[in-house]
Amino acid sequence: MHLEFTTGQTQTAVSLMPRHLDDCLRELILINQKKDAIDILEWRLDYWQAPAQLLTAAEKIAALDLPLILTVRTTNDGGLASAQDYLTYYAPLIKAHIGQAIDLEWSLAAEQRHQLAELAHQQHYQVLLSHHDTVQTPDNDTLRTQLLAMQADPDADLLKLATTAQSPADTTRLLAATQSFTHQFDKPLTTMAMSEFGVASRIFGGQFGSAISFGYLETPSAPGQLPIEQLKGLLTTNQA
């Protein structure tokens, strides 16, 4: 099962952020209650604090039979992990065939990123190359340069660019950059402008080519996220 996308149809995703098995089981109950609103799961492994329970939790998550992105978010991109944590989490989960894709940050050293991508591709995982600017939305030229550089990475199957909107105009510029990119390239791209100014990017991003919109179960994992059921309803209305 690979992540597959249709132009103009944004899929919904939620982030699992459990620290241990009990957390995981509680979140899985919520997911089952809201499963109709969820297309994709993301497992934020940088929150995990119980190494001995990792594979047990993984089997429970995999049993949901939803496409799963494995993510280790480092402090560089607003998460809790270090670059050294990638292999610690990804290696055993890939070996156990948990999930369909791994997230690799663009800020990782190129050699490490390539080695991790190679590990994933050998087991038929997709690689989501991501970048998160937790301060601003860069100027238009920088946005385009970033997207072109990520597109040119031969290890990347999917792309994700998140910026921080300091005004509604920032969101408009990111959506325009998304549209320009997706008209030129076939590689699936997900973008979002974080903050309250960027909520529109999560609702209308699909009309500009964005592939995934992230909502939340209980607590937002990024500023400006909407509850997953509300998000699914808005997307369904807009994409009808």
Curated annotation (Swiss-Prot):
GO terms, biological process: 3,4-dihydroxybenzoate biosynthetic process; amino acid biosynthetic process; aromatic amino acid family biosynthetic process; chorismate biosynthetic process
Active site location: 132 (proton donor/acceptor), 160 (schiff-base intermediate with substrate)
Pathway: Metabolic intermediate biosynthesis; chorismate biosynthesis; chorismate from D-erythrose 4-phosphate and phosphoenolpyruvate: step 3/7
Major enzyme class: lyase
The organism's place on the tree of life at top rank: Bacteria
Presence of keyword Endoplasmic reticulum: no
InterPro entries with a match to the protein in the record: Aldolase_TIM, DHquinase_I, Type-I_3-dehydroquinase
Keywords (A to Z) from UniProt: Amino-acid biosynthesis, Aromatic amino acid biosynthesis, Lyase, Schiff base
EC number: 4.2.1.10
Membership in a protein family: Belongs to the type-I 3-dehydroquinase family.
Subunit comment: Homodimer.
Protein's job: Involved in the third step of the chorismate pathway, which leads to the biosynthesis of aromatic amino acids. Catalyzes the cis-dehydration of 3-dehydroquinate (DHQ) and introduces the first double bond of the aromatic ring to yield 3-dehydroshikimate.
Protein name per its UniProtKB record: 3-dehydroquinate dehydratase
Highest classification ranks of the organism: Bacteria, Bacillati, Bacillota, Bacilli, Lactobacillales
Primary gene name: aroD
